[in-house]
Amino acid sequence: MTKLLSYINTSEDLKHLSTEDLNKLAEELREFLISSISITGGHLAPNLGVVELTLAIHKVFSPIQDKIVWDVGHQSYIHKILTGRKEQFSTLRQFGGLSGFPKPEESRYDAFGTGHSSTSISAALGMAKARDLQGSNEEVLAVIGDGAMTGGMAFEAMNHAGHEQANMTVILNDNEMSIGTNVGALSSYLSRLRTDPKYHRIKEDVEFLLKRIPAIGGKMMKSVERVKDSMKYLMVSGMLFEELGFTYIGPIDGHNIPQLMEVLNNAKDKNGPVLVHVITKKGKGYEPAEKFPDKFHGTGPFEIETGNAPKKAETAPSYSKVFGDTISEIARKNESVVAITAAMKDGTGLTNFAREFPERFFDVGIAEQHAITFAAGLARKGFKPVVAIYSTFLQRAYDQIIHDVCMQDNPVIFAIDRAGIVGGDGETHQGLYDLSYLRSIPNLIVMAPKDEAELQRMLNTAVNINKPVAIRYPRGKGEGVTLWENMTPIPLYKGETIREGSQVAMIGVGKMVPDMLEVADMLKKEGIEPTVFNARFVKPLDESSILEIAQKHEYIYTFEENTELGGFGSQVLECLSKHGLAHKLIDRFCLPDEYIPHGDRSKVLSQYSLHSQELINKILNRLRGEQIEQG
């Protein structure tokens, strides 16, 4: 029997489908998702939870005309499948393939690019106001998860939307609650009343008639208001949105397609902003994902029958795990150490810390700005707060780093995970800007370890410095080196010469140091013995060592996994320029001034001629060119 999904190429193909067809299609979409993501990896559980919701949205609205903004965006896979990208789905998050997030450059159905949390309502409000100014009539929707709704930006946008009374719909996809039968039935009934225009006309007529009754009409009206208020406050969550100027509808069963369509159709007819509160089950339809939704939030390839990842040979621990284990070990000896994360406990490696030191662990939710200033307050009172955060999300709190931490010299430690190329998440999550935006801040010390053992030592060093410190380290497995037992601090503001050579010097930081060593090994086969220097500190830079290297070598190359503008190579160039040695710096090996796409690190490096063999070719071509000119 031919599957319905084989006939669905755009959302227009849904328009003629019956409810029975849509429910069957929902099953097929889940099968397709599970099969595909078991091979490519991706955000499985969130997308299994929004199958019916996405079908209802595409049935009621016209994604080509209407504007749908997905927040955070990782739950947009069904949207992609329904908008002509089904055949490309095997390339999801692969180099040169489909993005895991909405991307306007990828499809005209993607109204707005997302990837960072809590931005959808702001973007949707901007589009709604633009529509009004232009005199057009498209619908505007923001689909936001309950996690993203915890971000302050979402409430800033709702406050503004309520003030503007713009016609727009916010769909709150809440997968943290479950609706019992009685509550669900009552909710459905109340939702139908509140979304049916006839209800509002009757309510207004009753209020008008009551007010006209002599003597007792006013009292009766007050009684009605008290009853109404009592009922409203039974639905406290809705009240928050109502007070912000939204019409609140819900909770709605997010897996009931007819009910979703009815509510969305009624929401379209309302004036002003509407919030539709939808309850969904994360991982729905796949037992392992329902049982362990966090595990399948973002997953690698897995076996469909069991949900287990393919067994791999034992490898080095991840940088995140080494960080988590190390900071826990330090905390056992130092009671002033506390850990803070912004809704990324597992991702940053703090799960065990939270279990062992619950009173010293703080998950502030998706609130990076608050996390940083909260840490500054703790530091002000004598604690050693360690903020574990991804590089891409630290950007969101730049003002707080400057104003609340560094300007006051508060000793906050920033443990910056996912620095550099991050893989499948792509442009929105690349950690390629932190060296540039951090090194310009006074009072801040910036370090980058060459391997997981050096990360241990840097953490121990940071805890013993009464200054703000940032340590950036990459995603994924470490280098497999032996970890330290005593974790002796590293010498302050000093790099290390790993190999002593002549003529050519390679100076780098972080993840690129092992790459430098690989290049050095290959150059040695060509008869060239380069010096390899691990700078360790981006700020303050070990200028004395770098100047000494510059005076002894003819060709200097810098290596970093950061954008070229304002990064480590720029720092070295500035140092050399001050002393008339800028001509010695031949090339800065780094990422260009553009947004770097998703894909495996090795493929991304090759795309930008930063793979080991390509770097060697650049160095050899320069040296051979010089020899030819001299000859």
From Swiss-Prot:
A Pfam short name: Transket_pyr
**Top-level enzyme category:** transferase
Catalysed reaction per UniProt?
Answer: D-glyceraldehyde 3-phosphate + pyruvate + H(+) = 1-deoxy-D-xylulose 5-phosphate + CO2
Which pathway does UniProt place it in? Answer: Metabolic intermediate biosynthesis; 1-deoxy-D-xylulose 5-phosphate biosynthesis; 1-deoxy-D-xylulose 5-phosphate from D-glyceraldehyde 3-phosphate and pyruvate: step 1/1
- Please name the InterPro entries in this protein's record: Dxylulose-5-P_synthase, THDP-binding, Transketo_C/PFOR_II, Transketolase-like_Pyr-bd, Transketolase_BS, Transketolase_C, Transketolase_CS
- UniProt keyword annotations, A-Z: Isoprene biosynthesis, Magnesium, Metal-binding, Thiamine biosynthesis, Thiamine pyrophosphate, Transferase
Look up the record and name the cofactor or cofactors this protein needs. Answer: Mg(2+); thiamine diphosphate
Domain of life of the native organism: Bacteria
> What molecular function terms (GO) are annotated for this protein?
1-deoxy-D-xylulose-5-phosphate synthase activity; magnesium ion binding; thiamine pyrophosphate binding
> Which terms under GO biological process does the entry name?
1-deoxy-D-xylulose 5-phosphate biosynthetic process; isopentenyl diphosphate biosynthetic process, methylerythritol 4-phosphate pathway; terpenoid biosynthetic process; thiamine biosynthetic process
One GO cellular component, as annotated: cytosol
| Cofactor descriptive note | Binds 1 Mg(2+) ion per subunit. Binds 1 thiamine pyrophosphate per subunit.
Annotated positions binding Mg(2+): 146, 175
| Keyword rRNA-binding in annotation | no
Which SMART domains has this protein been placed in? Transket_pyr (SM00861)
Q: Does the keyword Membrane apply?
A: no
Q: Where does thiamine diphosphate bind?
A: 74, 115-117, 147-148, 175, 286, 368
The protein's matches in CDD domains, at most eight in alphabetical order, are given as: TPP_DXS, TPP_PYR_DXS_TK_like
PROSITE patterns per the record? TRANSKETOLASE_1, TRANSKETOLASE_2
Which Enzyme Commission number(s) are listed? 2.2.1.7
| Family listed | Belongs to the transketolase family. DXPS subfamily.
Q: How does it assemble?
A: Homodimer.
HAMAP family named among the record's database cross-references: DXP_synth
Q: What does this protein do?
A: Catalyzes the acyloin condensation reaction between C atoms 2 and 3 of pyruvate and glyceraldehyde 3-phosphate to yield 1-deoxy-D-xylulose-5-phosphate (DXP).
This chain belongs to the protein called: 1-deoxy-D-xylulose-5-phosphate synthase
Organism for this UniProt entry:
Natranaerobius thermophilus (strain ATCC BAA-1301 / DSM 18059 / JW/NM-WN-LF)
Q: Which gene encodes it?
A: dxs
